[in-house]
Amino acid sequence: MTAIMFDIEALDIRPTAAIASIGAVLFEPRSDWIGDTFHLHVSLENCQRHGLTFGASTITWWMGQDDTARQTLINGQLDAAPLITALEAFSAFCPTGADIWCNGNSYDMPILANAYHAVGIDTPWHFYNERDLRTLKGLNKTLRIERSGTHHNALDDAIHQARLVQHILQFNSDLDA
């Protein structure tokens, strides 16, 4: 069954964080198939107008990141979509009833869900479809795959994370995810 892996780049660690970008990919967890991708930059000014927050420690952390990641974050603001536009586009990208994966259910999922709440629209997933890569990685601490793309680029991270799920589930065929 087709699933979604998403990643966000945000400017705070709280669930109320302003979102700078959303990246996602459709994938089959039990095969090597990687499908359509989604990547949108979100207007930070518009996020602020919707009450989303910025954290000094996160902004300082971004200052210390790789030049490519920082420039992508900065340049993305030049053509960034309003928050509601980005979320409506992400909702349209998500297949109905699909499992939705992220690296950790304590960061990406609540931040994205809160952004939907802030603009008054429902998330395109149900709570029972939420999946967490961090749990799988914890069960398979020695498995590694080659990384491609830029760290902290939402789309590159989503693709890498989808490949990690595929690799872990293929290596552990007895897991039912």
Task: Please give the residue ranges for each predicted region.
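Conserved non-catalytic scaffold segment of RNase H-like nuclease domains
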Residues: 2-4, 9-102, 148
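Anionic group-transfer/hydrolysis microenvironments
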Residues: 9-11, 25, 104-105, 110, ...
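Short, function-defining helix-loop hinge/capping sites that tune catalysis or transport
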Residues: 15-17, 140, 165
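Acidic, Mg2+-coordinating catalytic module of metal-dependent nucleases/exonucleases
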Residues: 99-106, 110-111, 143-177
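Short, flexible loop segments at boundaries between secondary-structure elements
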Residues: 124-144
